[in-house]
């Protein structure tokens, strides 16, 4: 049997590199003679699927994108030029579609977010004082198919009104015959005269008004008798808020006596449940300042075993010697001030004694000299004679 014949490759291996090089040269020459992908725009797009390369002289068509329309006639195609660039065109004639104009609502205002009615923009609505908005506060310009439309109906501004305020027991409010209250209308409550000795107190806000949400600014107040007990404080006294009876919001201020301090608040107020808030304070006695207690010293006498100590008939602990506090280091000596004052007096007495002694000695010398001068000459009318005498 003859062996199978070997099949030869139509492209010998030695020729393959040459063929590959030729293909690259042809591809390079074809790419250099073509344009790349055509330009893209915000407002318009190609009417056909784009290709990676276009021959010289080849043309592409454009049209406005969805949501845009032709504002004016314009060039809608571009051509691959000989210099391998696209003929310049613009998308400015394609403009956004707009929603229809919405005027300001009665007693309100419509505000464009970006100053335009084109799709994608917003329209905000607000109402004047005394009116509230019924409907959507913001409308959006959206695309519906090929048209631009608003996302809803425009709202309206309705006048703010409140229902009559609630009635209260033991009291009344002004304008009780009015059925509808407008924005910022106000009523004032008051209490009726009480049948007993104590009057009614108005608990809460006396005046309320109609707010922008058609509700009253506060709950209705309450009329009831509020009376707190007479406040009594030991070791202290009342200095403000005197009275025989204490009704709602009565305020009392206390002061402590000397040697005491207040526990609690010195100011209390009668609240709506007839109790003092905070509670009536108390006065506690002030404690003396703490001092360090000196150590106690005790002296004991030891005796020999043969010495028998006498037995005392008095029972109890043995007396111990405690030196005064002034003998410990760091404690002042109570006699120190007395000694200082005595030293001053002693010095003064010594000085006075010296002065008195000097005066006595001076006086004695003076008397002695006077006696010596009395020994002199005695003259008479008849004769002159010298007489020596001694004064007695």
Swiss-Prot record:
Tissue expr: Present in blood, liver, lung and testes. Isoform 2, but not isoforms 1 or 3, is present at the erythrocyte membrane (at protein level). Whereas isoforms 2/3 are ubiquitous, isoform 1 is expressed only in testes, brain and heart.
Range of residues in the leader sequence: 1-32
Cytoplasmic topology ranges: 366-392
Post-translational modification: N-glycosylated. Probably less N-glycosylated in testis.
Positions in the Extracellular compartment: 33-344
Main location: membrane
One annotated Gene Ontology cellular component of this protein: cell surface
SS bond list: 35-80, 64-94, 99-141, 127-157, 162-210, 191-223, 228-270
InterPro entries in the cross-refs: CD46, Compl-Cell_Adhes-Reg, Sushi/SCR/CCP_sf, Sushi_SCR_CCP_dom
SUPFAM superfamilies given in the database record: Complement control module/SCR domain
Entry-listed glycosylation sites: 114, 290-292, 296, 298, 300, 302-304, 306-307, 309, 311-313, 315, 320
Protein name, UniProt field: Membrane cofactor protein
Entry keyword set: Complement pathway, Cytoplasmic vesicle, Disulfide bond, Fertilization, Glycoprotein, Immunity, Innate immunity, Membrane, Phosphoprotein, Repeat, Signal, Sushi, Transmembrane, Transmembrane helix
Assembly and interaction partners: Interacts with C3b. Interacts with C4b. Interacts with moesin/MSN.
Record Pfam families: Sushi (PF00084)
Positions of transmembrane segments: 345-365
Chain intervals with Low complexity compositional bias: 287-319
Function: Acts as a cofactor for complement factor I, a serine protease which protects autologous cells against complement-mediated injury by cleaving C3b and C4b deposited on host tissue. May be involved in the fusion of the spermatozoa with the oocyte during fertilization. Also acts as a costimulatory factor for T-cells which induces the differentiation of CD4+ into T-regulatory 1 cells. T-regulatory 1 cells suppress immune responses by secreting interleukin-10, and therefore are thought to prevent autoimmunity.
Localization annotation: Cytoplasmic vesicle, Secretory vesicle, Acrosome inner membrane
């Amino acid at each position: 049997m003859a062996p199978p014949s070997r099949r030869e490759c139509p492209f010998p291996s030695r020729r393959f590199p040459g063929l590959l090089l030729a293909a690259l040269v042809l591809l390079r020459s074809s790419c250099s003679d073509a344009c790349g992908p055509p330009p893209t725009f915000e407002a318009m797009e190609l009417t056909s699927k784009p290709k990676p390369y276009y021959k010289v002289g080849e043309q592409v068509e454009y049209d406005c994108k969805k949501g845009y329309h032709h504002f004016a006639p314009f060039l809608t195609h571009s051509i691959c030029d000989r210099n391998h660039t696209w003929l310049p065109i613009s998308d400015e004639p394609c403009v956004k579609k707009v929603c229809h104009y919405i005027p300001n609502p009665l007693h309100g205002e419509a505000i464009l977010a970006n100053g335009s009615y084109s799709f994608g923009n917003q329209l905000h609505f607000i109402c004047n004082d005394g009116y509230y908005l019924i409907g959507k506060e913001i409308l959006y310009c959206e695309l519906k198919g090929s048209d631009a439309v608003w996302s809803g109906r425009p709202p309206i501004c309705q006048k703010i009104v409140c229902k009559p305020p609630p009635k209260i027991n033991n009291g009344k409010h002004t304008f009780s015959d009015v059925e509808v209250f407008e924005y910022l209308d106000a009523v004032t409550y008051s209490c009726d005269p009480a049948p007993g000795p104590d009057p009614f107190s108005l608990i809460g806000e006396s005046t309320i008004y109609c707010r922008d949400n058609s509700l009253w600014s506060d709950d209705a107040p309450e009329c009831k008798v509020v009376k707190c007990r007479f406040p009594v404080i030991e070791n202290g006294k009342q200095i403000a808020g005197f009275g025989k009876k204490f009704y709602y919001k009565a305020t009392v201020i206390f002061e402590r006596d000397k040697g005491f301090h207040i526990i609690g608040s010195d100011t209390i107020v009668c609240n709506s449940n007839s109790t003092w808030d905070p509670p009536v304070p108390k006065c506690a006695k002030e404690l003396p300042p703490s001092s360090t207690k000196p150590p106690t010293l005790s002296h004991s006498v030891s005796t020999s075993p043969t010495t028998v100590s006498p037995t005392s008939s008095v029972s109890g602990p043995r007396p111990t010697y405690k030196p005064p506090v002034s003998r410990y280091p760091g404690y002042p000596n109570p006699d120190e001030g007395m000694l200082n004052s005595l030293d001053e007096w002693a010095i003064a007495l010594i000085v006075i004694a010296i002065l008195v002694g000097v005066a006595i000695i001076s006086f004695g010398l003076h008397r002695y000299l006077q006696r010596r001068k009395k020994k002199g000459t005695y003259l008479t009318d008849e004769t002159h004679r010298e007489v020596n005498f001694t004064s007695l």
